[in-house]
Amino acid sequence: MSRGLGDVYKRQIQGGDPNGNGTGGADQTIKGEFSSNGVENEISHTRGTISMARAQDPDSASSQFFIVQEDSDYLDGNYAAFGHVTSGMEIVDQICKDVPVEDDNGTVKAENQPVIEKITITD
């Protein structure tokens, strides 16, 4: 998990990395589903949006994702938003407030990383 200090990073929580340090992912990647990569995606990065994290390659997403704490429309068109937090944003806010970071990239030490205990997918 990472949560950054800079203007971009302090407004999101990243997860889904099996290594816990921002370098892990699945063996396969998926096509980035956003407009700058030729795919229409009308979901805006508003508070509570869940989106795929990726490296510089637009088709490099695998298991990592991020939750947007504050509206971040500058991400629209370049990251694949795919859902929204429907309850529990107060927990996202608490994590952003209380979890200490160790560097300007927002890295959180393993012993301080929150654990997602339950996710429910709804239509």
Language model regions located:
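Generic detector of bulky aromatic hydrophobic side chains
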Residues: 1, 25-26, 99
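Glycine-rich, pocket-lining loop/helix-strand segments that form or immediately flank
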Residues: 11-43
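Cyclophilin-type peptidyl-prolyl cis-trans isomerase
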Residues: 39-123
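Single conserved hydrophobic/aromatic residue that forms the stacking wall/gate
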Residues: 1-9
